[in-house]
Every structure is written in structure tokens, then in C-alpha cells.
Amino acid sequence: MRLVFAGTPEFARLALEALLAAGHEIPLVLTQPDRPAGRGLKLTPSPVKEAALAAGIEVAQPRSLRLDGRYPDEALAAQARLVAVAPEVMVVAAYGLILPRWTLALPARGCLNIHASLLPRWRGAAPIQRAIEAGDARTGVTIMQMDDGLDTGDMLLERTVPIGAETTAAVLHDELARVGAEAIVAALADLPALAPRKQPEQGVTYAAKLDKAEAALKLDESAELLARRIRAFNPVPGASLRLPGLNEPVKVWQAEALPESSPAAPGTVLRASAQGVDIATGQGVLRLLELQKAGGKRQSAEVFVRGWQPA
């Protein structure tokens, strides 16, 4: 099938490579412009761009696809290329740009999106993190037909993935990327036979974009919620808190809620040992298992406590 692929991060790269391996013709890839990255802030191509160029595919990187937006010349150029390519389907995976109506209407069979949740739960920008944060036991991937709304299109195919008690966003991301790549290949293979299904009106939730301010843990919340949030924010933006005796916040990469309570004020360090740093919270006790001082490396609690003494 003749496709155009629109995507940007690692999640999308796996889908692009799977589509190529399945024999689909992809003459054009859309991805976001190169961004500064690393300590030197060197302009760096997206994972999708790297994969496309390695496969000899033309890449377009408009800053917007809105013909009436801030970059109309770039949008017009992209429109001209899409019209010339005349795709049967556009596959979209974490592209990062809004697709205006002209884009949605251009492919003969429409635009299919790989969304990292079981819709209608967790529509929006951060479905992986919000599913972990909420304590969901499962999530998955939905292949849907795109429309004007925010992840509101008809569903073609779903794949379910369990969320384990220790699953981080990094681990879940990689699993959903793999499942999503398999799902889009399967959906395209069965496209004529797949019956679009309306999303249920019940159970709609929105996965708000991550805010860096959320990374600072509020210890008056429950230990269970804090432990989930630490997993949800691993690796980005990375949860943090302040510990006595240290001037800078400490990143927390792994923690668990202990089956005990404490009358101490939230934030009180109860114990610091090789087993972990135990902190009183608004409800329960949070044990920190893996930490990172500002400018330092990740350390197990056992190593961390050797070089730290609570004031």
C-alpha cells in the first residue's frame, strides 16, 4: 500500500520500520524539525527522520501544516508534496503537529493514528504516564481513524498490554511502541474487512501534557500515589524531592509504598538504611530505593546513604 508516514520520536520509529519491513511503499515521511539536544545543544534529527533517511525516503519537516498559520509557505510546500505523492493512507504516530482538515481529507482511505491507550481512556498527550500514575492495571494501543477531535475518531483495532506493579514509563513506552508497530501492520493488512467502531461515550479521560512542575513530589499525598508518580515520570521529567542536609532536590527513580503508617509529619525521614530511605507521607510511608543527587549518578539507596547524613 502507498503510504505517507507522519511521526517524530522513538515510539514512531518502530512503526515506520515495521511498515517498511511489511513491504509498504512510503515515498514521503513527515517529521518535526531538528531540535537542539545534548550539552552542546547541537541540532539533532528526530528518530523518525534518521530511520527515513537510512531507508532513502524523502523527508519533509514543516513547522506547521496550517495554511492560515504562522508558516503558510511551509504548509503549502508540504501540501504540494502530499498531493503529488497521492497516498492511500497516512499513518500518524506521535507526530506532534495538529493535522488540519485538508490533511485529513487528502489520503484516499484517510489518516490512521497509533494511539498509546485503550480509547476513550487517556485521550491526549501523555497516555503512558497518566495510565501508570492513575494505577491502571492495563493499557494498550488503539488504531483509529483520525477526525477533527482530540483522539475522538472511530476505532479499527485494539491491543491490550498489562501494567505491572513495577512498570516504569520507559518500560511501558517500549512495549507499547512494539505492540503499536505490530498493530498498524495488522490493521493495514485487514483494512478492507475492519469495521470502524464509535468510541464509547462513557469512560472518557484526558491525559494532560506533562508539566515539569509536577516532577516535584508533594509529600502530603499518599505513598501509593507518590510511588506510582515516580514510575510514571521515569525517565521524563524525573520525580524529585528535597532531603535534609542537601541543598538541591534529589531525583527519585525507584520507590515503593510500605504497608505501614506513621504519625510523623509528611517529609520526615523515618529511617535511612541499605534497604532504603523511608519518608512519612500524607498517607503511609514511602521507601526510596534509587536516587540521584544533583550532578551525580543514579545510586541504590545502599550507596546513597553512605554519603548522606540527615541533618
Swiss-Prot record:
Assigned GO CC terms: cytosol
Gene3D superfamilies xref list: Formyl transferase, C-terminal domain, Formyl transferase, N-terminal domain
E.C. number: 2.1.2.9
A GO molecular-function annotation: methionyl-tRNA formyltransferase activity
Catalytic activity of the protein: L-methionyl-tRNA(fMet) + (6R)-10-formyltetrahydrofolate = N-formyl-L-methionyl-tRNA(fMet) + (6S)-5,6,7,8-tetrahydrofolate + H(+)
Keywords: Protein biosynthesis, Transferase
Function, in words: Attaches a formyl group to the free amino group of methionyl-tRNA(fMet). The formyl group appears to play a dual role in the initiator identity of N-formylmethionyl-tRNA by promoting its recognition by IF2 and preventing the misappropriation of this tRNA by the elongation apparatus.
HAMAP family, per the entry: Formyl_trans (MF_00182)
UniProt-recorded name of the protein: Methionyl-tRNA formyltransferase
Organism: Bordetella avium (strain 197N)
